[in-house]
């Protein structure tokens, strides 16, 4: 698991906290206005027709609220949610056990759905399309297929890598929603709401400062608030002020744009060793000692979002904005 402070991936200590902070309705949910408004319409229409909601695929970077939205969908539909993940479903029998335990209308939430094995996907296809399950009983010549009817249900899949889903699986989702990075104002509102739940006083400017450095991600904003709260209690009077916030984030090595030592290592590695690029992903991986898929899925998305890095056919290139951030001159071609 990635223990990095600025990782959007969920850490062990985040789980209970996120559950306590999780909004229960779309009205309470901050941000993701486009996805939220569309879901409001689809949910209301399904309820008016007394049908289950179409299967929903939520995709986007980690930490943006996919699990929260899955739970909200179940709450808005007035049904239960059953949660599992792609890696947890190892055999067709595991999936069959989950599907046959569902009640009519229930939401089945599969996190990291792109990690489902293809043999599992094939069992899922008839379940999604026809609400039935084909089970093979026995082996060899005496084997026979038995079809079980399933109650109507809604599958909500979440993934950080929509492109890794097979086309047949992706095409079976009726609703596809991409979750975007949050604005500073949205994150500031989330930080203030979290501080209220924590019963911690926070200045509005301090909330904005945390939001600016949270990489557009609510999970990171809440994690930073927890760490800043520690400094406020030990080094201050318990109130999260602008002064305490700036001091804490500096000591935590989170700069004004939300970059940490790993981001600096990646960008400066390309600048200093490869004159800013282009350089291939595998070479970057060997240079900074991180696995290529971790660089691609965890570190690069935010650097691409803020325009510090470009992916080109010839490799990664550091942009003039990154040079400016480090106070360096871009080499002349």
From Swiss-Prot:
Subcellular location: Cytoplasm
Catalytic activity line of the entry: ATP + H2O = ADP + phosphate + H(+)
Any one annotated GO CC term: cytoplasm
One annotated GO molecular function: four-way junction DNA binding
Main location: cytoplasm
Residue span of region Head domain (RuvB-H): 256-333
Top-level EC class as recorded in UniProt: hydrolase
Binding site for Mg(2+): 67
Binding residues for ATP: 21-22, 63, 66-68, 129-131, 172, 182, 219
Spans annotated as Small ATPAse domain (RuvB-S): 183-253
A single BP term in Gene Ontology: DNA repair
Disulfide bridge partners, by residue number: none
Region (Large ATPase domain (RuvB-L)): 1-182
Catalytic activity, EC: 3.6.4.-
InterPro entries the UniProt entry points to: AAA+_ATPase, AAA_lid_4, DNA_helicase_Holl-junc_RuvB, P-loop_NTPase, RuvB-like_N, RuvB_C, WH-like_DNA-bd_sf, WH_DNA-bd_sf
Keywords recorded for this protein, A-Z: ATP-binding, Cytoplasm, DNA damage, DNA recombination, DNA repair, DNA-binding, Hydrolase, Nucleotide-binding
Binding site for DNA: 311, 316
Subunit and interaction comment: Homohexamer. Forms an RuvA(8)-RuvB(12)-Holliday junction (HJ) complex. HJ DNA is sandwiched between 2 RuvA tetramers; dsDNA enters through RuvA and exits via RuvB. An RuvB hexamer assembles on each DNA strand where it exits the tetramer. Each RuvB hexamer is contacted by two RuvA subunits (via domain III) on 2 adjacent RuvB subunits; this complex drives branch migration. In the full resolvosome a probable DNA-RuvA(4)-RuvB(12)-RuvC(2) complex forms which resolves the HJ.
Family according to the record: Belongs to the RuvB family.
PANTHER family linked to this entry: HOLLIDAY JUNCTION BRANCH MIGRATION COMPLEX SUBUNIT RUVB, PTHR42848
Swiss-Prot/TrEMBL domain comment: Has 3 domains, the large (RuvB-L) and small ATPase (RuvB-S) domains and the C-terminal head (RuvB-H) domain. The head domain binds DNA, while the ATPase domains jointly bind ATP, ADP or are empty depending on the state of the subunit in the translocation cycle. During a single DNA translocation step the structure of each domain remains the same, but their relative positions change.
Function of the molecule: The RuvA-RuvB-RuvC complex processes Holliday junction (HJ) DNA during genetic recombination and DNA repair, while the RuvA-RuvB complex plays an important role in the rescue of blocked DNA replication forks via replication fork reversal (RFR). RuvA specifically binds to HJ cruciform DNA, conferring on it an open structure. The RuvB hexamer acts as an ATP-dependent pump, pulling dsDNA into and through the RuvAB complex. RuvB forms 2 homohexamers on either side of HJ DNA bound by 1 or 2 RuvA tetramers; 4 subunits per hexamer contact DNA at a time.
Protein name: Holliday junction branch migration complex subunit RuvB
Lineage of producing organism: Bacteria, Bacillati, Bacillota, Bacilli, Bacillales
Gene designation per UniProt: ruvB
């Amino acid at each position: 698991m990635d223990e990095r402070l600025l990782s959007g991936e969920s850490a062990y200590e985040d789980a209970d906290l996120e559950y306590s902070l999780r909004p229960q309705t779309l009205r309470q949910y901050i941000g993701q206005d486009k996805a939220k408004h569309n879901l409001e319409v689809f949910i209301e229409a399904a309820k008016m027709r007394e049908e289950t909601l179409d299967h929903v695929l939520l995709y986007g970077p980690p930490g943006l609220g996919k699990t929260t939205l899955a739970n909200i969908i179940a709450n808005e539909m007035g049904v239960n949610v059953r949660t599992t993940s792609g890696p947890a479903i190892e055999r067709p029998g595991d999936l069959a056990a989950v599907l046959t335990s569902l009640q009519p209308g229930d939401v089945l939430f599969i996190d990291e759905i792109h990690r489902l094995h293809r043999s599992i996907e094939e069992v899922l296809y008839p379940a999604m399309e026809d609400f039935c399950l084909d089970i093979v009983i026995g082996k060899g010549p005496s084997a026979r297929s038995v079809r079980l009817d399933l109650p109507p249900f809604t599958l909500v899949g979440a993934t950080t890598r929509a492109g890794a889903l097979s086309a047949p699986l992706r095409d079976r989702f009726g609703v596809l929603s991409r979750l975007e990075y949050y604005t500073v104002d949205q994150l500031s509102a989330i930080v203030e709401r979290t501080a209220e739940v924590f019963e911690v006083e926070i200045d509005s400017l301090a909330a904005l400062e945390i939001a600016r450095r949270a990489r557009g991600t609510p999970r990171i904003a809440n994690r930073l608030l927890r760490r800043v709260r520690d400094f406020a209690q030990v080094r201050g009077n318990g109130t999260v002020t602008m002064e305490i916030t700036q001091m804490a984030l500096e000591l935590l090595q989170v700069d004004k744009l939300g970059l940490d030592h790993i981001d600096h290592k990646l960008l400066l590695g390309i600048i200093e060793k490869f004159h800013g690029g282009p350089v291939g992903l595998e070479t970057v991986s060997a240079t900074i000692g991180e696995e290529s898929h971790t660089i691609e899925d965890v570190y690069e998305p935010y650097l691409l979002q803020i325009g510090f890095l470009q992916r080109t056919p010839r490799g990664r290139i550091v942009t003039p904005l990154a040079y400016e951030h480090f106070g360096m001159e871009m080499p002349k071609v």
